[in-house]
Each structure stands twice: as structure tokens, then as C-alpha cells.
Amino acid sequence: MWATEDEGLTGVTFDSDGHSLVGVLYLARGEEPKPTVLLLHGCPGLEKNLDLAVRLRDRGWNALLFHYRGCWGSAGRYDLRTIPRDVTAAIDHLAGCPRVDAGRIAVLGHSMGGWAALVTAAVEPRLQAIAVYGAAARLGAVTRLSPDRIEHEFTRFLATTPEEFAVQLNMVAERMDGLAAAAAIEPRPLLVVHGTADRWVPVAQARELRERAGPSCCYVEVEGADHAFSWHRAELGDLIVGWLNEAVTG
């Protein structure tokens, strides 16, 4: 038996530049429009934050988890440069959902999804609050990986090649810097959470992100947490939900 909206979640598809993107919309109890979080996974997206979606739903939030073009069942070729457009398409989809309060849409991004949240929010005023954890705000460091490492860590899961991916990384690193985007988010609330044991994105980058952001930025370091907060998920969930409740619903 497949879950339906009455059971708290439903499958969704929506269009982005002619490509059909797939996702799951977790729906809080009640028919009235609810505040909603857009969840952005990283690259390739092994950690999909399903636990956070359930926690948000249990606390009265809707949550949409979707997949960018070219990964995890979404159509098209994977391209870092088009991910912000996919995020905008997801916002368009949410804004048309009757059980979504279009005036209370937030975004939560992890790793590369944190970068996507930052660069999209800089030009997308419909995002009322922005939260990131383990954010790869500056993707330049990834460009130094070998082609074999890129294939092993990323492209074997994606509809692209190591060579194409390297070109995308270089272009994004030069033209779409998440650290630079952070200042444009002000005065909207921004939450930056980072683990001190993150081996993919050094905590120094998160501290620089805090410096670049405006006074509405809330910065939290979690001692011993790794890139995916593997052993700190409950703490992460409570932190994010509590902050969102304050930032969006007051």
C-alpha cells in the first residue's frame, strides 16, 4: 500500500526547464496552509535528510525533499550550474500547493545543498529563512580532487562525467560563490551550523561564512560533529526546528 497525503506524505513531480524532477512532500496534520521547508541535499546526495523531514512534519511543518536534474530519478543531465534554477522551480511548485503557506517558505541545505540555498536565497525573496549545515559555501576546494576521486565520490551516482563535472565545478567556483551570496540574504534570518570534525568542509569556511553574513546570522558550532552530523542527528534536528519556529513563525 502506497502512502497518500492523508498519511502525511505524497510523491511529487514538477518541471524545471523541461525536465521532470521528483520528490517527496511531507505534510503536517491539518488541511490549513502550513509553513514549509525546502530540503536541499548535497552532491551526490547520499544523506537525504529524511529524518529531518519527519521531525519537521511532527512539529507542524511541511517539508519538500526533491532531487536536482540528473540524479536519483530526476530527468536530465546533472549540472551544478542549473541547480539554483531547479531550486527556484521547487519554490514555484510549493507556492502553488494549497497546503503550503506561500508566505512562510524556508530552505535548509546540507553540503553542496547549503551552497545552493545561499546562492538561490540571494536572489529569491520568497525564501523567508535560510538554514545550512556543513555548507560547502565555496566549491573551489573540490576542484583540486583527481578525476578518479571525483568519479568515486560523485559522478558514479550522477548523469554526468568526471570531465563535465570538473568543468562545472570550475565555472561555479568562479561565478557563483556562496560566501559572497551570504551578505545579500540580510536582513532575513540565516542559520549556519557546522561540525568541528567536518573533514569535507573545514570549519574555518563556516566561520568565514559567519563573517560575510549580516547581523541576522545565527552561528552554531557542534563539537565533534562530522560533515553529515552522523552521530548528532537528534541534536541537529532539535536545533533546526527550534530556530525555524522562532525565525518564521515567531
Write out the residue ranges for each language-model feature.
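Short amphipathic alpha-helix adjacent to the substrate-entry channel of hydrolases
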Residues: 48-65
